[in-house]
């Protein structure tokens, strides 16, 4: 099991991860209530959230998340084709619908589980006003989504982007265009167009490679 520590909005989070389970450990003082029954709504069942169970004592609160088999990570996606990276970016935008739920969340890569088909599921979620993050709205979601998307295509980590680098770093033109957009729908539209373009290019390249291999095999067969 590996330990991952991150800080978001001034609060430290400790993730303990293995292939089948994630744990998030918080200090009891990080939860601004003595009524732990209020946290039961975090055990919600939703296709965009990992299944969760919870335990606590006088000092700590522990959340356990069940993982699907053969999950991926961001490093794996970054090594894949541009179209697959764009597909992940689009799937992150789909999490916008979770804003309608009575919980909050954040889009740090360590808090998002990527399934084998690149769907994205949220691990840690919070009760509004008594946990971090206290709230999340469309504007905040858009900012975090942009940070995640740029983290896919560059070496800039989510945290530094979120803390201010998002607005000042140099990025390729298509990412700069994404950065300037003012709504999730505009970002989705731009990414979708780029995704279709890259799929066509990659499909054409694959066809050329297959034809070249066939010709090579054909000529080799003649000389054998």
Where are these regions (language model features)?
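C-lobe/activation-segment region of protein kinase-like
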Residues: 6, 101-103, 115-217
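Conserved structural core of kinase catalytic domains
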Residues: 10-87
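Short, hydrophobic/amphipathic alpha-helical packing segments
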Residues: 86-94
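Protein kinase catalytic-loop region centered on the HRD/HxD motif
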Residues: 93-102
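Hydrophobic HxD+1 residue recognition
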Residues: 107
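Hydrophobic residue at the +6 position relative to the catalytic HRD Asp in the kinase catalytic loop
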Residues: 110-112
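Membrane-anchoring helices that localize proteins to membranes
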Residues: 216-224
């Amino acid at each position: 099991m590996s330990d991952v520590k991150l800080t978001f909005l001034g609060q430290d989070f400790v993730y303990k991860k293995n292939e089948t389970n994630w744990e998030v450990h918080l200090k009891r003082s990080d939860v601004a209530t003595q009524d732990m029954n209020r946290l039961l709504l975090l055990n919600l069942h939703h296709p965009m959230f990992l299944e969760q169970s919870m335990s606590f004592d006088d000092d700590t609160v522990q959340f356990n998340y069940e993982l699907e088999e053969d999950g991926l990570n961001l490093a794996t996606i970054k090594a894949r084709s541009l179209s697959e990276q764009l597909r992940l970016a689009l799937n992150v935008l789909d999490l916008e619908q979770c804003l309608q739920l009575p919980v909050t969340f954040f889009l740090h890569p360590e808090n998002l589980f990527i399934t084998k088909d690149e769907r994205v599921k949220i691990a840690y979620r919070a009760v509004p006003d008594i946990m971090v993050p206290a709230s999340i709205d469309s504007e905040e979601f858009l900012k975090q989504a942009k940070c995640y998307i740029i983290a896919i295509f560059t070496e800039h980590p989510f945290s530094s982007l979120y803390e201010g680098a998002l607005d000042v770093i140099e990025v390729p033109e298509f990412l700069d265009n994404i950065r300037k957009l003012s709504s999730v729908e505009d970002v989705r539209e731009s990414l979708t167009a780029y995704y279709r373009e890259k799929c066509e290019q990659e499909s054409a390249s694959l066809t050329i490679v297959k034809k070249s291999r066939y010709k090579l095999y054909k000529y080799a067969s003649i000389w054998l």
